[in-house]
Amino acid sequence: SLLNPNLNANMKSVIVIGSGFAGLSSATFLAKSGYDVTVLEKNDSLGGRARVWESEGFKFDMGPSWYWMPDVFERYFKSFGYEVSELYELVRLDPSYRVVFGPNEHEDQSANMAELEAMFDRLDPGSSKRLRKFLAEAAYKYEVGIKDLVHKPSRSLLEFADLRIIKGLFQLDLLKNMRKHVAEVSTHPKLKAIMEFPVLFLGALPQNTPALYSLMNYADMSLGTWYPKGGMHKIIEAMVKVAKEQGVKFRTETEVKGFQYSGKKIVGVLTKTGGFSADIVVAGADYYHIDQEVSDKDRREYSKQYWD
């Protein structure tokens, strides 16, 4: 976790590849810890997938369209002395979204829990009671999974030697998969599709995903779907503001094409316009892109077949 980067600030210079959420977050926390940070972005504007495209007076989000888990953003901005409300205005969407099953066949996901439960009971009488139990368990998983596990640096198992965490592991459903867990609420095909849907954000299949990730259903159904007025780029604008206040420097239209090495250590990056040396290089771009297109062939972690 870069919330408490336990790094040696004597290693002063840092290059961050990419100005998406991950790159900006890394850059701001490292700069706050005393590093000299430069972000390199290949596009002509900042934001990575969350950049904005403007044409004929219209603005279009180029990537994310939903704002989930608002507490994560609140935690980030509070680390730099800001409330989210000082930087952009959030609106909770109702319905959260529409699930389309076919021509003239859809279900709206209400932001109102009573209406959501009524929809479950309409499709599968009695299922709302099981949904409440499911979400109560998911809320616990969210509390432990996000607040006690995700925000730890994961450098040592000793970080997790906490009685609350150890006790909590037995309630996280690590040995059950999401498909079976969802079936405990309902086997109705539409409800199963609605409840399994958030797992897709993990790039996984429900049958291969631990039931721990029902915490995503809690994020969806209980915490809600939000949208920043003015578009997703408002978040990027806020993060760039914070980054610049911390002293982060930005270079757009600077695509990283390769790494500079000294033995096994990366000591810089190569671009079309020249090289940039750094004590630390943080890759905020896609894993595939870094592994297959930026790293030298003999230094790639995975084969092309693995990615295919």
Predicted regions: what they are:
Residues K12-E143:
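N-terminal glycine-rich phosphate/pyrophosphate-binding loop and immediately adjacent elements
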Residues S13, V267, D279:
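Conserved acidic residues
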Residues T225, K229-A238, E245, F259, ...:
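Glycine-rich loop(s) and the adjacent beta-strand/alpha-helix scaffold that form part
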Residues T252-I266:
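A conserved short coil-to-beta-strand element within the FAD-binding core of flavoproteins
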Residues G102-P210:
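Rossmann-like flavin
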Residues S1-N10:
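N-terminal amphipathic/basic-hydrophobic helices that include classical n-h-c signal peptides
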